Amino acid sequence: MYKISLSLLLSVAAFTSTYAYDWLARIDDDRRVCRLSIPGTHDACTGYGFLPQDTLAGNYIARTQELNISEQWAVGVRAFDLRPDVREEKSTKSSKKAKETKRTLQIYHGEFATQQTFNGVFNVLRDSLQAHPTEFAIIIMQHERSANRDGSTWEAMVDYALAENSDLIVDFRPDLTVGQLRGRILVLSRDTYRPTPRGGYIEGWRFDAEVDWQKPATMHGYAMEGTLCVQDFYNMTWEGGTTAKLEAIERLLKVANSEEVAKQYPNMWFINHTSGFKYTSTEFTKEPVSTSEGYRANAADTNKFLAERIKGHMTTGLVMMDFAGVDRSGNYDVMGKRLVQAVINSN
């Protein structure tokens, strides 16, 4: 275990020596964020590992990253997929023998609680932005609902957490520029927590492989609305699934660089997922679910595929990947370091 950890640490150190913390410093203030190429991480907090009760199953089923948020930041990742839900812990007060419930916005992947919290991520990003004010962060979040958890307080807890960090959060507008976002965070939520967002809401998220830019999702902030073309086709377990995924990735890349699309939607945003899984298992569940090896096998195909298709200066949009910042995970060449480099270089 020590050798693996040391190897990973050396790999990250070598990467950050070339791709320092401040790659956005090279980007002009007036560049629109929607026209950038930004590396991102799918289920970003699984790199922290899982809480003790979820460690065994979580590592088998739900691991999509090797690096934690600080390490992802160090290699150049600037977009983070977060899945908070309410975690309840009951403790007994010794004086009254009464049980008290403590509620935390824990980051989950499915049923499994990672070792990071929603507030914890903001603390990491706040420190990173203070140390590197030329940079910015984008959070894409959703409520990771479960029948096994009481999420009834989720909306209020998310709103409170975002209000506590309101000095960092930028209101969404489709023509948002790098200069307007430097040193701050754009929070885009796929679930609502109040009538108007602190950042932006996304409606119409898609999971198919079609990539139809003429039927875009919508993004809206307090006063302005924009369009989004998203590719998040994630289940490659069927025959032909990998081919369909690769074609969808390439299709969105072409859409993001199409003159026709730019003419009709000059401020369209793009999110392209290389993430997904190829294998399922019933090792810990009654029904087949994704596995960490399935995520690795998919990443070995998709991360390399997209890295090879990024040529010169082009727009990739937000590229949400598994195993960002490392080229090897488990038994697979996941090419997450190579893809992060390619995305950054395309700016």
What positions do the PLM features span?
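Conserved, mostly hydrophobic/aromatic
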Residues: 72, 83, 139, 187, ...
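Aromatic-lined glycan-binding groove of carbohydrate-active enzymes
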Residues: 184-288
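Aromatic-lined carbohydrate-binding surfaces of glycoside hydrolases
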Residues: 77, 82-90, 147
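Fungal secretory targeting signals
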Residues: 1-17
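Active-site groove signature of glycoside hydrolases
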Residues: 86, 133-148
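Loop/turn elements at helix/coil->beta-strand transitions in domains of secreted/extracellular proteins
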Residues: 75-80, 132-138, 182-184, 265-267, ...
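Acidic, His- and aromatic-enriched active-site or binding-groove loops in soluble protein domains
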Residues: 114, 118, 158-174
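Long, acidic (Asp/Glu-rich), low-complexity accessory segments flanking structured domains
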Residues: 17-75, 88-131, 136, 195-200, ...
